[in-house]
Amino acid sequence: TKDPELKQCKKQQKKQQQYDDDDKK
Protein backbone atom coordinates (compact mmCIF):
# COMPACT_ATOMS: atom_id res chain seq x y z
CA THR A 1 0.00 0.00 0.00
CA LYS A 2 1.05 3.57 -0.53
CA ASP A 3 -0.69 4.73 2.62
CA PRO A 4 1.92 6.55 4.72
CA GLU A 5 -0.06 6.10 7.92
CA LEU A 6 -0.41 2.38 7.34
CA LYS A 7 3.29 2.17 6.62
CA GLN A 8 4.00 4.00 9.86
CA CYS A 9 1.68 1.62 11.68
CA LYS A 10 3.46 -1.43 10.28
CA LYS A 11 6.80 0.08 11.21
CA GLN A 12 5.55 0.63 14.74
CA GLN A 13 4.29 -2.95 14.92
CA LYS A 14 7.61 -4.30 13.76
CA LYS A 15 9.42 -2.26 16.39
CA GLN A 16 7.04 -3.48 19.07
CA GLN A 17 7.58 -7.08 18.00
CA GLN A 18 11.34 -6.66 18.26
CA TYR A 19 10.96 -5.36 21.79
CA ASP A 20 8.68 -8.27 22.66
CA ASP A 21 11.22 -10.73 21.27
CA ASP A 22 13.96 -9.13 23.33
CA ASP A 23 11.82 -9.47 26.44
CA LYS A 24 11.31 -13.16 25.80
CA LYS A 25 15.03 -13.85 25.51
From Swiss-Prot:
Q: How is it modified after translation?
A: Glycosylated.
Q: Where is this region: Disordered?
A: 1-25
Question: Which superkingdom heads the taxonomic lineage of this protein's source?
Answer: Eukaryota
Ubl conjugation listed as a keyword: no
Tissue specificity, in the record's words, reads:
Expressed in seed.
Provide this UniProt record's keywords sorted from A to Z. Answer: Glycoprotein
Q: What else is known?
A: Exhibits hypoglycemic activity in RIN-5F cells (in vitro) and in diabetic mice (in vivo). No hemagglutinating activity on rabbit erythrocytes and does not increase IgG and IgE immunoglobulins in rabbit plasma.
Spell out the protein name for this chain. Answer: Insulin mimetic protein
State the species of origin: Cnidoscolus quercifolius
